[in-house]
C-alpha cells in the first residue's frame, strides 16, 4: 500500500519543488509542520475505532493550501543522504538545490503527475478501507480477498506506467487537527516516526469516537532513506500479535512534539514536556565524538507494558526510533489514560541547533501498515502524558502467556477499571448478590461495555463466565433484559439459579400455562417492573405477537435494557448447530434499533464469528475473546471396535471414574438404548436419553442424572447437554464420531465445568464416516453448498482423529484460529496430557509419493470419477472400497484383484496402510463416492480426488508418518496418591456437604449445585471451619445464602472444626487403634500438648502384654492415618509430634477402654447453638 503512496508523491514532486522553494521564505517556522500535516483528508471510517481524548475545545483547523513540503529534506552533496535543517537557524538553505534541466522539466510532468496522483490515491484509499476491515487473525479466511487482490493489481499497473516520474517528494495529510500550530515558534524539521502496524477492524468503535487528531502515514523520498532488509520484529503478547519481516519506517517532521521516555523496566509512560526535559525536538544532540550527528531517543513502548525488543542492526543511528520495532502498535494498544488534559497546550521551544544529516530509514514495502494502525501509532507517540517518573497506576496491562493469546486485548482498555458512574453499584451487587470477589478474564471489560450501551460479542469457553457478563448488567441497569436461549432446559436451569440469588427473573416458553404467562405479561406492563431478566426461546420471539407487543411497550417506555443472544453460533449457517429461528432474530435490530445487543457463544471459528455479527446486524460490536483452551480437560482418542464399544466404555469407567457422573454420546437412538442396557447389565447405573422418549421420561432421566439419584451415566444423542449446567461431569465419552470440530468441542466441553480435571474420550472408527456422510446427504434442509460445508466439517474431525503426531489440544485450538498456543502445554501439565503427547514418538516420516502415484494410476484404470458409480465405466473397471484397496495394496489373499498395485505395500503393517489410504482421502488425492444399495446400505467406493493429477505431475509430494504398532487401549497404571490425614478429612467433609446440598435441593426444589457450586463446596471443605466470617470470604457464599442454608452447612462443618481450632482440640481426647501408634517404632504416634492419648493414659505394662492380631497385614502407617492421632491447624500451621502432658498417665482408664473398641473414631463435640447471627438458625425441619 505504501508503495502506492510513494508513486503518488513522485507524480507531483517535481512540479512542486520550485513552488515550495519560492514559498519557503514566506513560511513561518511553525507552518512547515502544519503544511506537512494538512495533505490527506481522512474518511470517517478511518478513525471510528479511535477513542477520543475529549478535549475541552475543538482544535483549530489548518489551511490545506500547501500540499507538499519537499524542502524539509535536503540532498547532501557528499553522501546523498537527506539532511534535516531548522528553518530558523538556516533560512538560506530552505530553497532546494536542483539542476536547471530538472527545474525546466518539472512543469511538464505536473499535470500528468497530478492526474496519476488522484488515481493512485483513490486506489490506495480503497485498499486501506479493505485492509482496515480485516483483523489479523482473520487474514487466513478473509471474505474480500478477491477484491483486495484486484485493487493491488490495479495499483501495480499504475506504478508500472509511472516509472518515468520522479518520486522525490513528500505528501502530508490535509486536514489534520494537531497541536503543531499551537506554537508558531516551534522548530519544524524534527522527525516523527510512524511505523507499520496491523490492520484493525472497525469492531470496537463507538459512534462518538471521531474527534481524535489523526495522522495518515506519509511516504518519503526513496533516495533519502536506506533499506533495512529482513528485519524480524519480536512478536507482542497481544490478542492479535504477528511476526512481520521487511518492515518499513517512515519519518515525518511535524512541529516539536514531546518524547516518551523508556523506564528501566521496559515500559514507557508518555511524558508531558517540561522545561528541563523538552528541547523542542524529538531528536537530541549527543555529546562526545558523535556530537556532529543527531540521534533519536530510545523508542517508547506502549503504555500497556507490552514487550517488544529492539532488533535493528547495531550501529545504526536510527535504530533507537520506536517505529523500528513497534510495528504491531495499533488501536489495540491505545490507552486513553496516556493523554493528558493539557496535551493541546503549546510547548515552549528552545533554540534550534544546526541540523545534521537525517538518519537512514527503511523504505516502504507492500503489505505495510493500514491507515488506522499508523494513525494510532502516531497519535500515541505524539501525545504527551504523565511524567515518566510518576506513571499512572492501573494503566499497565501485563503481557499474557502464549497459552492464552486471545485475552486482555488492549483495545478494551477504556472499559477497564472502576471509573464509571455505575461502578459503585455494580460492585455492590457483584459482592452481595453473586458473592464473588474477583472477575475472570474479560468479564469486567464486557460488563462495563454493556453498561455503557455498546453492542458486545463475547466468545468464551465453557466455564469462562459468560452468564455473568449479562446477568450483572441486568441487575444494575434499569428495565428488563431479554435473554434468548435455544433450549427450555437451559432456560429453566438459569432461572432457577438466579432465584437462589434473589434476582427477579422468569421465562416465557411454549409449555407454561396461560395463567403463568398472564402473570408475567402483567408484571411487564407495570410502571416499574420488578423483572430484571426475561428468558425466551427464539421460536417464542418469532411467533408470539403478544410477546412482541409487550417488548414494544417496554421499548416505548425506555425499559427495554438489552437483548442477549445466548448460544449465538446457532445464528450462523456455517455453524455446527444452525437454526432458522435464530437467523430471524435480526428483526429485533430492525424493530428496536436503539436497544443494545449482546451475543455469546463458546464455539465459533473466525468465519462463524463474522457471520454472527452480520446476521444480527450488530452495530460496531465490542469483541471480547478468550483462549479456547480448557486447561482442565484431558483429550484422548482410542480405536473403536463397533461391537465392543459399550464394553470398552464400561471397562474405562470402572477403571478411572467408578463413582463419578459422565456422559456417553451415541450416534443413534438405538445405540443409546443398547449401550445403556449393557451398562445396566454390568451393574452401572445408566439411562438412555434421546428424542424418542416422551417429554416426561426425558425430564425424569435428566433429573435423576443431574441429582445423581439412580443414574451415574447418561447415554444420549448429541442434542443432550446444551441446556445442562452440571458442573461435576468428570468424563464425556464419544462412542461415535462427532459431525464437526465445533460439535466435539462443545460436547466434550460439558465435562469439568467446575475447573476440576476431567476426561474427554473419543472412540474412533473410519466406518462412522460413511454413516455420517449418508446422514448429511439425507438432510432435507440445505442445498449442495451447505452439504459440502458439512462434509468439510466432518473431514476436519476425521483429520483430528487420524493425526497421531500433533497435540490434540493444539489441533482443536488451531481450528478456531488460535495458532500461537504454547506447544509445551501438555508437557508442562502432565495431569492433562493428551494421548499424542504422552505417546512415545514411535513414528517416522516417509515420502510415499511413488507409492501414491501407483495407487492413483490403479484407480484411474480400474475406478471412475466422482459420481460415476451409476454411469458408464471403462472396460475392466470395478467398485473398490477403501478396505478392498488396502487388501490389494498389502497383497492379501482375499484381494479382489491381483495385479497393478497388488502386494506393493507388503512392507507396511495393515494399520499403516489403512491410515495411508485415509490420509489420501483427507488430502483429496482420493475421494469416496457414496452408493445406496437395494438394502438401504451405504457403501463408499474409491474414486480419484481433485489433487490426484497434481501428484502425477510432480507438483505435490506426499509425506506419511508411519507408526510401529496399531493404537490400542493403553494400559495405564492407576496412580495411588498417599493422602494425608487432613486431606482425608477434607474429602469426607466434601462428601457430607454434597449430600447436605442434595437434601436442601429437594426441599427447595432446585439443583443441588445451584445452592453451592462444586468449587465453592470444595473451598468450604478445605477450610474445615464453621466460622461464618471465614465462609463469607469464599466466592459463591453470600449472606443471603447463609441465611437460607447456613445452619445446615455449619452443622456439618462443626464436626471438622477441631482440625483448625486448637481450643476445640484441647477439649477432645483422641484414641488410637490397637497396634498403631502404640507399637514400637511407629512413625505416626503424635498428639497435641494438651491432648492425652489413651495409650499413654493406661498401665505402663500394657505395651508388653498387648498382642498383635494374627491376621493384621496392613501397614502401620495406614492404620495410623485412619486413626486420627495427628492434629492439624488451619492458616498454614504445621502439625507436629506432641509431647505428653504432665499427668497424662493418670488419665481415666475407663474412658480409654471405652473408646478403644470404637476403631479409632474421631471425638465429635456437640454442635454449637448459634445466638449472634440470625441466619444461622435452621431454615427447615426434616420430617
UniProtKB/Swiss-Prot annotation:
One of the record's GO molecular function terms: 3'-5' DNA helicase activity
Cofactor note: Binds 1 zinc ion per subunit.
Protein source organism: Gallus gallus
Catalytic activity: Couples ATP hydrolysis with the unwinding of duplex DNA by translocating in the 3'-5' direction; ATP + H2O = ADP + phosphate + H(+)
Compositionally biased spans, kind Acidic residues: 38-48
Residue ranges, annotated region (DNA Holliday junction binding): 865-910
Protein name: RecQ-like DNA helicase BLM
UniProt key word Transferase: no
Record field: compositional bias (Low complexity): 1143-1158
Region of interest (Disordered), ranges: 1-109, 164-215, 260-323, 381-408, 1068-1183
Annotated binding of Zn(2+), by residue: 807, 826, 834, 837
Repressor recorded as keyword: no
Biased composition, class Basic residues, residue ranges: 1133-1142
Family, as annotated: Belongs to the helicase family. RecQ subfamily.
Transmembrane segments: none
Amino acid at each position: 500500500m505504501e508503495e502506492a503512496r510513494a508513486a503518488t508523491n513522485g507524480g507531483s514532486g517535481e512540479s512542486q519543488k520550485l513552488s515550495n522553494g519560492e514559498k519557503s521564505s514566506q513560511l513561518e517556522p511553525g507552518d512547515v509542520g502544519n503544511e506537512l500535516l494538512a495533505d490527506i483528508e481522512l474518511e470517517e471510517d478511518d478513525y471510528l475505532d479511535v477513542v477520543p481524548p475529549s478535549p475541552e475545545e475543538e482544535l483549530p483547523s489548518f489551511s490545506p493550501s500547501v500540499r507538499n513540503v519537499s524542502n524539509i529534506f535536503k540532498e547532501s552533496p557528499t553522501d546523498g543522504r537527506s539532511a534535516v535543517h531548522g528553518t530558523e537557524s538556516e533560512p538560506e538553505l530552505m530553497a532546494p538545490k536542483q539542476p536547471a534541466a530538472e527545474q525546466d522539466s518539472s512543469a511538464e510532468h505536473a499535470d500528468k503527475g497530478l492526474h496519476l496522483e488522484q488515481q493512485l490515491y483513490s486506489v490506495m484509499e480503497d485498499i486501506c478501507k479493505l485492509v482496515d476491515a480485516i483483523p489479523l487473525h482473520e487474514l487466513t479466511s478473509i471474505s474480500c480477498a478477491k477484491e483486495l487482490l484486484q485493487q493491488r493489481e490495479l495499483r501495480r499497473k499504475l506504478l508500472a506506467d509511472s516509472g518515468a516520474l520522479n518520486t522525490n517528494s513528500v505528501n502530508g495529510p490535509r486536514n489534520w487537527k494537531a497541536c503543531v500550530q499551537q506554537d508558531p515558534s516551534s522548530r519544524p524539521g524534527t522527525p516523527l516516526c510512524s511505523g507499520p502496524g496491523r490492520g484493525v477492524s472497525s469492531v470496537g468503535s463507538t459512534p462518538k469516537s471521531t474527534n481524535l487528531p489523526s495522522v495518515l502515514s506519509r511516504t518519503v523520498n526513496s533516495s533519502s532513506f536506506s533499506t533495512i532488509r529482513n528485519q524480524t520484529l519480536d512478536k507482542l503478547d497481544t490478542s492479535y500479535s504477528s511476526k512481520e519481516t521487511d518492515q518499513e519506517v517512515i519519518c515525518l517532521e511535524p512541529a516539536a512534539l514531546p518524547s516518551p521516555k523508556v523506564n528501566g523496566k521496559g515500559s514507557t509512560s508518555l511524558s508531558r514536556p517540561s522545561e528541563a526535559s523538552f528541547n523542542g525536538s524529538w531528536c537530541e544532540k549527543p555529546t562526545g565524538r558523535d556530537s556532529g550527528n543527531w540521534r533519536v531517543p530510545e523508542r517508547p513502548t506502549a503504555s500497556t507494558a507490552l514487550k517488544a525488543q529492539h532488533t535493528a542492526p547495531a550501529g545504526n543511528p536510527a535504530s533507537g526510533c520506536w517505529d523500528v520495532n513497534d510495528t504491531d502498535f495499533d488501536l489495540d494498544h491505545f490507552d486513553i489514560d496516556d493523554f493528558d488534559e493539557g496535551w493541546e497546550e503549546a510547548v515552549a521551544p528552545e533554540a534550534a541547533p544546526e541540523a545534521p544529516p537525517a538518519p537512514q530509514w527503511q523504505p516502504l514495502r507492500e503489505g505495510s501498515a493500514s491507515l488506522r494502525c499508523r494513525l494510532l501509532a502516531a497519535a500515541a507517540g505524539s501525545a504527551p502524558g504523565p511524567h515518566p517518573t510518576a506513571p499512572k497506576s492501573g494503566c499497565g496491562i501485563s503481557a499474557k502467556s502464549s497459552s492464552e493469546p486471545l485475552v486482555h486485548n488492549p483495545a478494551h482498555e477504556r472499559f477497564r477499571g472502576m471509573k464509571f458512574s455505575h461502578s459503585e453499584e455494580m460492585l455492590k451487587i457483584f459482592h452481595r448478590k453473586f458473592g464473588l470477589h474477583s472477575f475472570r478474564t474479560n468479564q469486567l471489560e464486557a460488563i462495563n461495555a454493556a453498561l455503557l450501551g455498546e453492542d458486545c460479542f463475547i466468545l468464551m469457553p465453557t466455564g469462562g463466565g459468560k452468564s455473568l457478563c449479562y446477568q450483572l448488567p441486568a441487575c444494575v441497569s434499569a428495565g428488563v433484559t431479554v435473554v434468548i436461549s435455544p433450549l427450555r432446559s437451559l432456560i429453566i436451569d438459569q432461572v432457577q439459579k438466579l432465584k437462589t440469588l434473589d434476582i427477579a427473573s422468569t421465562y416465557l416458553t411454549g409449555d407454561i400455562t396461560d395463567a403463568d404467562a398472564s402473570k408475567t405479561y402483567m408484571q411487564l406492563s407495570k410502571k416499574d417492573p420488578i423483572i430484571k431478566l426475561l428468558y425466551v426461546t427464539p421460536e417464542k420471539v418469532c411467533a408470539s405477537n403478544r410477546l412482541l407487543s409487550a417488548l414494544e411497550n417496554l421499548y416505548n417506555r425506555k425499559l427495554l435494557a438489552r437483548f442477549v443472544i445466548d448460544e449465538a453460533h446457532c445464528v450462523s449457517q456455517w455453524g455446527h448447530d444452525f437454526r432458522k429461528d435464530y437467523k430471524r432474530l435480526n428483526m429485533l435490530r430492525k424493530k428496536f434499533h436503539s436497544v443494545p445487543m449482546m451475543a455469546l457463544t463458546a464455539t465459533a471459528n473466525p468465519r462463524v464469528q463474522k457471520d454472527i455479527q452480520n446476521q444480527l446486524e450488530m452495530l460496531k460490536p465490542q469483541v471480547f475473546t478468550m483462549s479456547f483452551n480448557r486447561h482442565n480437560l484431558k483429550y484422548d482418542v482410542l480405536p473403536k471396535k463397533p461391537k465392543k464399544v459399550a464394553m470398552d466404555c464400561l471397562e474405562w469407567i470402572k477403571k478411572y471414574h467408578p463413582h463419578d457422573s459422565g456422559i456417553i454420546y451415541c450416534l443413534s437412538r438405538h445405540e443409546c438404548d443398547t449401550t445403556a442396557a449393557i451398562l445396566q447389565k454390568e451393574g452401572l447405573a445408566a439411562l438412555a436419553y434421546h428424542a424418542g422418549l416422551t417429554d416426561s421420561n426425558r425430564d425424569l432421566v435428566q433429573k435423576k442424572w443431574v441429582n445423581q439419584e439412580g443414574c451415574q451415566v447418561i447415554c444420549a444423542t448429541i442434542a443432550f447437554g446444551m441446556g445442562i449446567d452440571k458442573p461435576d461431569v468428570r468424563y464425556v465419552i464419544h462412542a461415535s464420531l462427532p459431525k464437526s470440530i465445533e460439535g466435539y468441542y462443545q460436547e466434550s466441553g460439558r465435562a469439568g465445568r467446575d475447573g476440576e480435571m476431567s476426561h474427554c474420550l473419543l472412540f474412533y472408527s473410519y466406518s462412522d464416516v460413511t454413516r455420517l456422510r449418508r446422514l448429511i446427504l439425507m438432510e432435507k434442509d440445505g442445498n449442495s453448498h451447505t452439504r459440502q460445508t458439512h462434509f468439510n466439517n466432518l473431514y476436519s474431525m476425521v483429520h483430528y482423529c487420524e493425526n497421531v503426531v500433533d497435540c490434540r489440544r493444539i489441533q482443536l485450538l488451531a481450528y478456531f484460529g488460535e495458532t500461537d498456543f504454547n506447544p509445551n502445554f501438555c508437557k508442562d501439565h502432565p495431569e492433562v496430557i493428551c494421548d499424542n503427547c504422552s505417546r512415545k514418538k514411535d513414528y517416522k516420516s516417509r515420502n510415499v509419493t511413488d507409492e501414491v502415484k501407483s495407487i492413483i494410476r490403479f484407480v484411474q484404470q480400474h475406478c471412475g470419477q466422482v459420481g460415476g458409480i451409476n454411469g458408464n465405466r471403462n472396460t475392466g473397471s470395478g467398485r473398490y472400497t477403501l478396505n478392498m484397496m488396502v487388501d490389494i495394496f498389502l497383497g492379501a489373499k482375499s484381494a479382489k484383484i491381483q495385479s497393478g498395485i497388488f502386494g506393493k505395500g507388503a512392507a507396511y503393517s495393515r494399520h499403516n496402510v489403512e491410515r495411508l489410504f485415509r490420509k489420501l482421502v483427507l488430502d483429496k488425492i482420493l475421494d469416496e463416492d457414496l452408493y445406496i444399495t437395494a438394502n438401504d446400505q451405504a457403501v463408499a467406493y474409491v474414486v480419484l480426488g481433485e489433487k490426484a493429477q497434481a501428484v502425477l505431475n510432480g507438483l505435490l509430494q506426499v509425506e506419511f508418518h508411519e507408526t510401529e504398532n496399531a493404537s490400542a487401549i493403553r494400559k495405564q497404571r492407576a496412580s495411588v496418591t498417599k493422602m494425608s490425614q487432613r486431606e482425608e478429612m477434607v474429602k469426607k467433609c466434601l462428601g457430607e456437604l454434597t449430600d447436605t446440598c442434595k437434601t436442601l435441593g429437594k426441599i427447595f426444589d432446585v439443583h443441588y449445585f445451584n445452592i453451592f457450586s462444586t468449587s465453592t463446596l470444595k473451598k468450604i471443605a478445605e477450610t474445615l471451619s464453621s466460622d461464618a466470617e471465614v465462609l463469607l470470604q469464599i466466592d459463591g457464599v453470600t449472606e443471603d445464602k447463609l441465611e437460607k442454608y447456613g445452619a445446615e452447612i455449619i452443622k456439618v462443618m462443626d464436626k471438622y472444626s477441631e482440625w483448625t481450632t486448637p481450643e476445640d482440640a484441647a477439649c477432645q481426647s483422641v484414641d488410637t487403634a490397637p497396634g498403631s501408634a502404640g507399637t514400637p517404632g511407629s512413625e505416626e504416634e503424635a498428639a497435641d500438648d494438651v491432648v492425652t492419648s489413651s495409650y499413654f493414659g493406661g498401665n505402663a505394662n500394657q505395651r508388653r502384654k498387648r498382642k498383635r492380631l494374627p491376621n493384621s497385614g496392613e501397614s502401620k502407617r495406614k492404620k495410623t492415618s485412619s486413626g486420627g492421632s495427628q492434629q492439624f491447624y488451619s492458616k498454614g500451621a504445621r502439625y507436629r509430634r506432641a509431647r505428653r502432658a504432665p499427668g497424662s498417665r493418670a488419665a481415666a482408664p475407663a474412658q480409654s477402654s471405652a473408646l478403644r473398641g470404637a476403631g479409632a473414631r474421631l471425638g465429635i463435640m456437640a454442635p454449637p447453638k448459634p445466638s449472634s447471627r440470625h441466619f444461622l438458625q435452621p431454615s427447615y425441619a426434616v420430617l
